[in-house]
Structure formats: C-alpha cells, structure tokens
C-alpha cells in the first residue's frame, strides 16, 4: 500500500519500481536452496530466528532509502535474508506433525500470514492518510513486530518435540517418528530429475507469478487505473489477501481429507486442478470489465481460487523430500520466487510501453492454467532418492 507513495517521493518510474519489487524476489529465489539446506542442517529454531530478525532490520532500513539504487540494494538484501522461512517451517511440520495433518498446517500458516497482510494493507492506508503519505514511518513501525516475534520464538521453540517440556508422552506418540534428520549428502541429482519435483517447481512458478501481482502492483492498479480513493483502495487491497487466506486454509484442510479417502496422489492433486482454472477465468473477466468494483471483486475471488494448490504443494514437498524436506521445499520455493521476480518486471515494462494492465493480467491467467496442467503429473508418493540407498521413515500414514 505504501509503494505508490514511495515511488512518487523517490521519483521512480514504473519500470524502476518493477525492478525494486523483483530485486526482493530474485534474492529470495537465489538464496532459498542454501537456506533450505541450512534449515535441514541447523534446525528451524535457529534458522527462523535469524530469518525474522534479518527481515525486521531490513524493513527498518527500507524506510531510510534515498533513491533507486539504495532501495534496490536494500530490497535485495531483504530477500536474501528472508529466504528460508518456508523451508524452516517445513522442518517444523516434518518433525512436529503426523503426515496427514501437514496440508492443513501449511494452509493455516499461510492463511495467518495472509490475514496479517490484509490487516497491514488497511492499517498502512490509515497511517498514510493520517500522516500525509509518510511511508518511511510505516516501515519503522512494522520492523518492531518481527524483533519481538524472533525473541519469543527462540525462547519458546525446540527443534524436537521430545526436547520441549510441555509435550507429553501421548502427544509424542501421536506425532510419531515424523521425518528423520538429514542423513548424509543431499541426493541433488534426484532432486532435479524427479518428475514430481520438476512439476511442483513449474506449478509454483505460475502460482507465485500471479500472487505477486496482488502483493506488489494491486494498490497502484486500484488507485491509478480503477480510480479508488486511498481509504477505499485500502479495503479493496485487503480483499484478495482475505480470499487467499480462506482459499489456502480450506484447500489444505480439504487436501488432508482427500488424502485419507483417495490417497496422496489424488488427494494432493485435486484442489489445484479445481481451483486454478477457475482463477484463470476470473482474472480474465476482471481485466475485461469496465466496472471498478466488479473488477476488484473478481480479482479477489481469482486470488482465492489460485491458492488451492499452495498448501497441497507444500505438503507434497514434505512427502517427496522426506529427510531432505528443507532442500526440497527450498527448491520449489526458488522457482516460485522466480515467478515472483518475473511478474513485477513484466507489469512495469507493460505499463511503460503500453500504459495498460491487459497484458499483465492475461499473463496471470495464462500461468494459472499452466499451473493447473502441472498438477496433472504431480505424484506426492514419488519420493526423491527412492532408487538410492537412503533411509525413509514415516511414509505409511495415508500413503496409497
């Protein structure tokens, strides 16, 4: 929500703003696989503490940027530090949850993040309205929350359930053995040649390509193209994130239920196969309607349906990755963030060349369809290294 004010204050063109948005996701993508290895090697307690403290500091530093180059560097460093949050989270779920709970857990985690983002959109609009567009204050305020979270997480969390004093014997039996700790070298060849892994990477590229329209350009689209005032734009910028929160949580819950009924292969596939084509149609309809409110509602609904493949995708990574879940989730998220890198650049260049949102929105619809096609070939029972000598534990629940 602060981006249009930052852009105006620093005198950035749409193409430059697209590069700023993409600097974050490019760094995130580049450092995601190493960060996933670190999550497997050093554990999520230390990893997630480091990630959140880093991004909190970079949030504050964003507020003191003075031009294009300084902002570009800060956002690149921001993305480099934030890389690893989801691989770290995957290790938490691999060690702390039974297999048939993981889709729901990922859905809830992403849902709460999206709800936080939705609240932030409206809160940012209020701060900007009350401070005459002081975007620097916004970044300073938000940096404090992460520092508090990092301290609480490091104090409270333990890498293993058995190390936590509040976990009883019954809970340990329910959790079971989970996934093993990383043993030996990562089977890199298997990671990059496994068919399910390749298709998961393609699927996530398309989903996050669309996701980043809503995270980066949506406020400007509402303000400049659809003619909303600042407070109304704040509400309508919230709406896609709320729909995404509902969609990702609902799909995670549905996927776990489907796994229990039809097995992992189709239980992980079905939500994305249903939601992504609907999302593509809704985005196409939004681009062609003249009514501003109708377009905003259609985009929000499309954003929600597009998330149907997110939680099942992360759960499939845990099931495919086993003891190397951090590396596998990091690999998928790398390709997702390459999509997130492409979208702001494409939109910025299209605005520069044609001053139109039609092409960017059509590419979002296309990649949603592409992601749906990828889901047809994703098999969550196809574990990496299955033909190699490696220990595989905890595959039995719900695997068919």
What name fits each language-model region?
Residues 11, 43, 64-70, 81, ...:
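Helix-breaking motifs and short loop linkers at transmembrane-helix boundaries and internal kinks
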Residues 30-69:
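Conserved MFS/SLC helix-loop-helix module at the cytosolic interface between two early adjacent transmembrane helices
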Residues 46-61, 266-284:
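Structural signature of the two symmetry-related core transmembrane helices
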Residues 74-113:
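Cytoplasmic helix-loop-helix junction between adjacent transmembrane helices
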Residues 103-122, 128-129, 244-248, 333-343:
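Glycine-rich segments within core transmembrane alpha-helices of 12-TM secondary carriers
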Residues 109-164:
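Helix-loop-helix hairpin linking two adjacent transmembrane segments in secondary transporters
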Residues 129-144, 229, 267-270, 349-367:
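A membrane-interface helix-boundary motif in multi-pass transporters
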Residues 194-251, 310, 314, 318, ...:
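Extracytoplasmic gate region of multi-pass secondary transporters
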């Amino acid at each position: 929500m602060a981006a249009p004010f930052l852009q105006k204050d620093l005198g950035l063109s749409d193409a430059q703003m697209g590069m700023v948005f993409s600097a974050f996701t490019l760094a995130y993508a580049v450092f995601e696989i190493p960060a996933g290895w670190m999550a497997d090697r050093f554990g999520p307690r230390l990893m997630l503490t480091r990630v959140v403290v880093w991004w909190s500091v970079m949030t504050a530093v964003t507020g003191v940027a003075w031009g294009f180059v300084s902002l570009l560097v800060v956002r690149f460093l921001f993305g480099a530090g934030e890389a690893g949050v989801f691989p770290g989270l995957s290790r938490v779920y691999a060690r702390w949850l039974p297999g048939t709970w993981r889709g729901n857990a990922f859905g809830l985690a992403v849902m709460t993040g999206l709800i936080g983002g939705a609240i932030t959109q409206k809160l940012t609009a209020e701060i900007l309205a009350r401070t005459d567009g002081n975007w620097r204050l916004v970044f300073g305020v938000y940096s404090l929350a992460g520092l508090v979270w990092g301290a609480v997480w490091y104090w409270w969390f333990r890498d293993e359930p058995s190390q936590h004093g509040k976990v009883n014997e019954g809970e340990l039996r329910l959790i079971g053995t989970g996934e093993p700790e990383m043993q030996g070298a990562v089977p890199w060849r298997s990671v990059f040649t496994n068919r399910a892994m390749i298709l998961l990477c393609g699927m996530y590229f398309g989903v996050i390509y669309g996701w980043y329209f809503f995270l980066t350009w949506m406020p400007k689209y509402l303000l400049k193209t659809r003619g909303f005032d600042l407070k109304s734009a704040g509400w309508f910028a919230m709406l896609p994130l709320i729909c995404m929160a509902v969609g990702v949580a609902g799909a995670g819950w549905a996927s776990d239920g489907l796994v229990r009924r039809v097995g992992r292969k189709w239980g992980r596939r079905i939500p994305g196969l249903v939601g992504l084509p609907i999302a593509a149609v809704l985005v196409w309809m939004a681009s062609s309607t003249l009514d501003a409110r109708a377009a905003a509602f259609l985009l929000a609904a499309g954003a929600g349906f597009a998330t149907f493949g997110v939680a099942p995708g992360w759960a499939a990574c845990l099931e495919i990755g086993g003891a190397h879940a951090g590396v596998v989730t990091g690999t998928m998220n790398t390709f997702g963030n390459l999509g997130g890198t492409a979208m702001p650049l494409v939109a910025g260049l299209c605005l520069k060349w044609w001053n139109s949102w039609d092409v960017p929105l059509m590419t979002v619809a296309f990649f949603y369809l592409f992601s749906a096609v990828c889901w047809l070939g994703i098999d969550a029972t196809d574990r990496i290294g299955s033909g190699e000598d490696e220990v595989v534990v905890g595959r039995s629940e719900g695997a068919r």
